[in-house]
């Protein structure tokens, strides 16, 4: 049995891509997208017609509506291939505006519903800022399920659990990147691999907290740099993996053992944690890595959203 099939015994495998033509070969349950992945996809010749068709069909509409229609078009194509859910991201430029995030999310869901898709097959991706988490709380209360992304800290995860969001995406690779850069020449790759990887440790701590305290929010590890990080999180509720790493897993027959387990998490001695807004902001501020990576991630997604807008305006 290859590693991909072995992993699927313990974990729901999700494909992290906008390149939906790659999906079928890996048979993922769900798929995730973001502005950067959509931007990358529409610059490929095989996907350029989707952008052109969207601009032509909805000519004269506001650019933000055209953007939403394009990402929903990609989402619909993905949902025609996979059996589960697709995650579609709200414009990252709204990351600090609760009301605007809610409004944009509702429009995205309405666009999916207009295509005949059930609301339960869509997760709205929102950056895990305080404002984003509060938007997710409101959306969940309205029956719209959310995926809180750009999650780098335990405090973000705790606040998401308190808000009863459907799913969180704690990032592994970007945490690894930060610590590796900080260590510089002193970084020991072998010593910091697997269970010692700081990104892996972050997800494990969040998973154990959720399962120990019976928090229903799903944990989907994201942002991987190598298959070792993925295998070290076998048993996590879900893992979203780029096609390149899915291919590496499919090509390897190395063993995959379950690492994360809800029963084991319940036996870990843990103290309950809760955050109000002030406590959340202070905890996030105290975590230099999470503060820097959250800000960097929002800037990057916002920049790619702006580039996508430029491509759409040029195609008009």
Swiss-Prot record:
Functional pathway: Carbohydrate degradation; pentose phosphate pathway; D-glyceraldehyde 3-phosphate and beta-D-fructose 6-phosphate from D-ribose 5-phosphate and D-xylulose 5-phosphate (non-oxidative stage): step 2/3
Family matches, as SUPFAM superfamilies: Aldolase
Active site (record annotation): 125 (schiff-base intermediate with substrate)
GO function term, MF aspect, one: transaldolase activity
One GO CC term, this protein: cytoplasm
UniProt GO BP: carbohydrate metabolic process; pentose-phosphate shunt
E.C. number(s) listed in UniProt: 2.2.1.2
Domain of life: Bacteria
Subcellular location: Cytoplasm
Keywords for this protein: Cytoplasm, Pentose shunt, Schiff base, Transferase
Catalytic reaction(s) noted: D-sedoheptulose 7-phosphate + D-glyceraldehyde 3-phosphate = D-erythrose 4-phosphate + beta-D-fructose 6-phosphate
Protein family: Belongs to the transaldolase family. Type 1 subfamily.
Function (record text): Transaldolase is important for the balance of metabolites in the pentose-phosphate pathway.
Quaternary structure and interacting proteins, as annotated: Homodimer.
HAMAP family: Transaldolase_1
Protein's recorded name: Transaldolase
Species of provenance: Acidovorax sp. (strain JS42)
Gene designation: tal
